[in-house]
């Protein structure tokens, strides 16, 4: 196997990998870890939690459908910084969640900037930066 590609492009591979794994904060598997605590703290049922999660996810998907194309229109660095800061903001905001409305907003933000934008952006950057070796890059992720 030819490892020269990985050594010469390590910097870019690290950036796309960090974005890809940073998306974990908005992924179902990560949020599900805290679902029991969220239900307990808010005194809500499984059904109510599922509805909140579904609403945040659907709103996020609708906005992602509308705004997903901006990943190809704006500078990658600026967009990456915006996504990371926004995702961190919604993670931090979870500390202050005191009502259902704020919880829905937080779930929306985590799903949009994590599951949606960070993972989409990492794949778009793979396509932009590695047009000839896109397959190798995606396999690396």
Language-model regions, residue ranges each:
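Helix-loop junctions at membrane interfaces in 12-TM secondary transporters
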Residues: 10-11, 95-106
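Extracytoplasmic
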Residues: 11-50, 63-67
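Hydrophobic core of transmembrane alpha-helices in multi-pass small-molecule transporters
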Residues: 21, 90, 101-117
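Helix-breaking motifs and short loop linkers at transmembrane-helix boundaries and internal kinks
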Residues: 43, 75, 96-101, 131
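Short hydrophobic/small-residue motifs within alpha-helical transmembrane segments
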Residues: 54-61
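Helix-to-loop junctions at the C-terminal end of transmembrane segments
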Residues: 62-76
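C-terminal ends and interior cores of transmembrane alpha-helices
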Residues: 85-98
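Intracellular juxtamembrane helix-capping segments at the cytosolic ends
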Residues: 116-130
């Amino acid at each position: 196997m030819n490892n020269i590609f990985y050594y010469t492009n390590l910097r870019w591979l690290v950036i796309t990998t960090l974005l890809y794994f940073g998306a974990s904060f908005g992924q179902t598997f990560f949020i599900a870890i805290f679902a029991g605590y969220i239900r307990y703290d808010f005194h809500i049922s499984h059904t109510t939690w599922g509805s909140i999660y579904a609403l945040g996810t659907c709103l996020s998907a609708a906005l992602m459908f509308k705004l997903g194309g901006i990943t190809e229109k704006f500078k990658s660095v600026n967009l990456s910084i915006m996504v990371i800061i926004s995702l961190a903001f919604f993670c931090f905001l979870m500390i202050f969640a005191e009502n259902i409305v704020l919880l829905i907003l937080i779930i929306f933000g985590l799903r949009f900037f994590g599951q949606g934008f960070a993972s989409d952006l990492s794949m778009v950057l793979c396509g932009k930066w590695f047009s000839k070796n896109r397959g190798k890059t995606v396999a690396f992720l």
